[in-house]
Amino acid sequence: MVRGPKKHLKRVAAPHHWLLDKLSGTYAPKPSPGPHKARECLPLIVFLRNRLKYALNGREVKAILMQRLIKVDGKVRTDSTFPTGFMDVISVDKTGEHFRLVYDIKGRFTVHRITAEEAKYKLCKVKRVQLGAKGVPFLVTHDGRTIRYPDPLIKVNDTIKLNLETNKIESFIKFDTSAQVMVTGGRNMGRVGTIVHREHHLGSFEIIHVKDALDREFATRLSNVFVIGETGKSWISLPKGKGVKLSITEERDRRRALKGLA
């Protein structure tokens, strides 16, 4: 029997962080193959239609994209199911708007507007560093980029600052204690803090202890940590909440205080 790639995705099987309601249809957009995994990405159609409300349906999204108005990391994208992901910069030429895809404290992609100056670069986590053919050194980033002849000081888990116009590495941050990080997986997804301690476990996962702005400490796996800045200073602007997770009672008190001011 002939088999092939799956071309459909049921709405109930779509990732929770897309925030699609179950009763609006049977199917959800199936992400195209691309730089981010299907469970960790946000298709362009979901971003433009469901988040920004720039379109009412898929046909309108395709009409916008075919006018070549939308850029992802400085490149025009016309595929409505193109998988955008963490740290990607989405630009809308006609309105002059720029967005960076980052997580909120509940682990969902948030609509985070940035300036035109900040849209010129993105941060990439180094996943692999090795020698290629004829001894040419190269590194591979979290979004599938291969960069040849990097700085020899750059190691795995470091973060590079990539210029989107020249595709050159401008600078890099070492993965070390006191570096500022954002958690990109697990139950603490979206939280921002400073690395306090690193636990080494042979044959198992390395554990990173992080302390947030309220001096609350939590732990996560090494693979879930993305360095976003040096001691006390982030290289990107952070969304509302600044990556600080509040307890249920603190959120309740905050809502009541805001309601009292209104």
Swiss-Prot record:
Keyword Ribonucleoprotein: yes
GO molecular function, one term: rRNA binding
Highest taxon above the source species: Eukaryota
Quaternary assembly: Component of the small ribosomal subunit (SSU). Mature yeast ribosomes consist of a small (40S) and a large (60S) subunit. The 40S small subunit contains 1 molecule of ribosomal RNA (18S rRNA) and at least 33 different proteins. The large 60S subunit contains 3 rRNA molecules (25S, 5.8S and 5S rRNA) and at least 46 different proteins.
Gene of this entry: rps403
Record's signal peptide: none
A GO term from the CC aspect: cytosol
PANTHER family: 30S/40S RIBOSOMAL PROTEIN S4, SMALL RIBOSOMAL SUBUNIT PROTEIN ES4
Modification Phosphothreonine, positions: 194
Pfam annotation, one family: KOW
The protein's role, per its UniProt record: Component of the ribosome, a large ribonucleoprotein complex responsible for the synthesis of proteins in the cell. The small ribosomal subunit (SSU) binds messenger RNAs (mRNAs) and translates the encoded message by selecting cognate aminoacyl-transfer RNA (tRNA) molecules. The large subunit (LSU) contains the ribosomal catalytic site termed the peptidyl transferase center (PTC), which catalyzes the formation of peptide bonds, thereby polymerizing the amino acids delivered by tRNAs into a polypeptide chain.
InterPro entries per record: KOW, Rib_uL2_dom2, Ribosomal_eS4, Ribosomal_eS4_C, Ribosomal_eS4_central_region, Ribosomal_eS4_central_sf, Ribosomal_eS4_KOW, Ribosomal_eS4_N
S4 RNA-binding domain span: 42-105
Biological processes annotated in GO: cytoplasmic translation; translation
Keywords carried by this UniProt record: Cytoplasm, Phosphoprotein, Ribonucleoprotein, Ribosomal protein, RNA-binding, rRNA-binding
General remark: There are 3 genes for eS4 in S.pombe.
Family to which this protein belongs: Belongs to the eukaryotic ribosomal protein eS4 family.
UniProt keyword DNA-binding, yes or no: no
Species per Swiss-Prot/TrEMBL record: Schizosaccharomyces pombe (strain 972 / ATCC 24843) (Fission yeast)
Subcellular location: Cytoplasm
Protein name as annotated: Small ribosomal subunit protein eS4C
